[in-house]
Amino acid sequence: MKVPSELKYTKEHEWVKIEGNRAIIGITYYAQDSLGDIVFVELPSVGDAVEVEEPFGVVESVKTASDLYAPVSGQVVEVNNEPMDSPEVVNQDPYGQGWMIMVEMSDPSQIEKLMSAEEYQALIEA
Amino acid sequence: MKFIPHTDEERRQMLKHLAVENTDQLFKDIPSELRLNRDLAVEGGLSEMELQSHMNSLAGLNTGVDQTICFLGAGAYDHYIPSAVKHILSRSEFYTAYTPYQPEISQGVLQSIFEYQSMICLLTGMDAANASMYDGASALAEAALMACAVTRRDKVLVASTLHPEYREVVKTYLHGPGIEISEIAYQEGLSQLADIDQKLDKKTAAVLVQYPNFFGCIEDLGKIAEQAHAKGALLVVCVDPIALGILKSPGQCGADIVVGEGQSLGIPLSYGGPYLGFMACKDKYLRKMPGRIVGQTVDVEGRRGYVLTLQAREQHIRRDKATSNICSNQALCALAATVYLSLVGRQGFKQVAELCLQKTAYAKELLAALPGYQLPWQTPVFKEFVLKTKEAPEVINRELLKENILGGLDLGGYYPELAGHMLFCVTEKRSRREIELLAARLGAIS
C-alpha cells in the first residue's frame, strides 16, 4: 500500500497536501483499493464551504457509495474535474491526477489533528 | 389451527429469561394514561365462509367500470387491457412487486425492467429511465426534488393546471426540505406564459407542468422549456403516456425530466392502486435520478447480461443521504406496462391515442351542442375536456348513475372558480353508441 510520507491523512482515508494556507485533498491508495472500480465522483463547487469531518462529496464504486469527509474547514478554491469526467483516474493515480479539491483553510491549526504517514500506515495495517 | 404461535408455556419461559413477571411490565415505560387499558373494539372472529360472504357484500357496494359506462378520468383511466397482460403478469417467476435482492441471479426480471426503461425512454424522448416509482404524483414530487439537487436551487413553479392531488403530494414532499412553491395561473385552460415569465427567477429550480394538463388541454411545452432554460431552471413534465402515441414527445420539446402515471398502460383501475410512476431524464442528470436502473452489459465470455445499478446510494450504505425514499419498487406494474406496450405495438399504441382523440372530439361536439352545456375554452384537448353545465354537476352525476353511466368529475371541489364545470374523459373503450347515450341523457337532464 502506497502511503507517501509528505502527506497528512484522516481516519476516513483522505490524504491532504498542505501548500501554504491551502489544502489539496484526495483519497488514499488504500481507499480506492478497498472501494474497487470507482464509477462516479461527486464533488462540491468552487466557492462552497466545507466543514472539518463533515461530508463534502461522494465516491461511488461498483460495490458501494461512500462519503468523502473534509480533513479541514474552509472554502473550496479549486475542483479537479478529472475524477468527475473519468472516475477511473482515482483508481489509477489517487495521489496525482485523482486529487479532488483544494481548500483555502479557515483554521490551519486543524492540520495538527491529522495523521502522519506512519500513523496512517499503522491504521490500515491494524 | 392456532394462529397465535406462542403457547402459555413459551411465553412464561421468555418472561422468565427476561426476568420480568408479566408482559405488562415490558410496556411500563409508556405512561398508563397513554395506554388503551381496555380490549380492542373488534368483534370475535368469523369463519372463512362468513368472512368471504361479508367481503363479497362489501365489494358489491362498489361501482366499477365493468358495471358502468365510464366517462370519468382525472388521472385514472379506463383503457383497454389485452388479456395476455394478466396471464404473463401472474406467472410465478414474475409475481412480485419487488426488484430482486440478489439481482443478477434474476436475469429475466432484470431484462423485463430493462425493456420497460427502454420503452419509457422511447415514449418520453429522454435518455434514461429508472426502474419505476410508486405512482405519478410521487414521481413528480421526486422530480421536483431532483431538479433542486441538480440546480442547487430551492424554489419550484408548479402549474395550477397540474392535477390538484399531484400538487398536494408535491407540497408534502417539498415541505420538509423547505423548498418554496409558487403556482402558475391559467387562462383558457392553459398555463399563462406571462405568469411563468414573471415568477421565474434565479432561485427557480424547475417549472412543473402536465401534458396534456388536468383539463385535457395541451400545454405549449416548447415555449415553457425556453422560458425555464433562459433562467437556468429545468422543465419537468408530467405526462399521460397514452397521449405520447400522437403528441410530440416532451424530450423533443426541451423537457429535462419527464414523469407520469403508468396506470393507463395495462394496469386496471382498482380503487386507486397499485399504480406505476415512471421517471426519465436527460443523460447529464442521470446520477441525480432517484431509484435504480437496470443496465445491459456483457459477461466475461461476451454474453449479454443485465445488472442493477445505482442501487448502493438508496438501498445500502447511504440511505440516510438519499434524496428519495424509493427503496421498494413497482416492478410488477412496470412489467404490466412493458407487456401492454409490447402487445399493442408501435402502431397499435398510436391507434389507441388516435381513438381517444377522435372519440373525445366527437363527445365534445355532441355535448357542447346541447342546451344548458357549453365549452368554457376553445383550447385543443386530448382525452378529457371541461364542460360548463347549467345543472349542478352533482345532480347530473346522480342522474347519470341511474342509467349506469359514470359521469365527469365535478371541478368545483378543486377549483372554486370552476364550480358548475365538469371534466369528462373519453377513452378508446367508449363506443359511438355510449357517447350518444351520454349526450341523450345529459340532454334530458338540462
Curated annotation (Swiss-Prot), chain B:
GO terms for molecular function: glycine dehydrogenase (decarboxylating) activity. CDD domains: GDC-P. Gene3D superfamilies: Aspartate Aminotransferase, domain 1, Type I PLP-dependent aspartate aminotransferase-like (Major domain). It comes from the Bacteria. Keywords: Oxidoreductase. GO terms for biological process: glycine decarboxylation via glycine cleavage system; nucleoside metabolic process. It catalyses: N(6)-[(R)-lipoyl]-L-lysyl-[glycine-cleavage complex H protein] + glycine + H(+) = N(6)-[(R)-S(8)-aminomethyldihydrolipoyl]-L-lysyl-[glycine-cleavage complex H protein] + CO2. It is an enzyme of class 1 (oxidoreductase). The glycine cleavage system catalyzes the degradation of glycine. The P protein binds the alpha-amino group of glycine through its pyridoxal phosphate cofactor; CO(2) is released and the remaining methylamine moiety is then transferred to the lipoamide cofactor of the H protein. Belongs to the GcvP family. N-terminal subunit subfamily. The glycine cleavage system is composed of four proteins: P, T, L and H. In this organism, the P 'protein' is a heterodimer of two subunits. PANTHER family: GLYCINE CLEAVAGE SYSTEM P-PROTEIN, GLYCINE DEHYDROGENASE (DECARBOXYLATING). This is Probable glycine dehydrogenase (decarboxylating) subunit 1. The lineage of its organism: Bacteria, Bacillati, Bacillota, Clostridia, Eubacteriales. The gene is gcvPA.
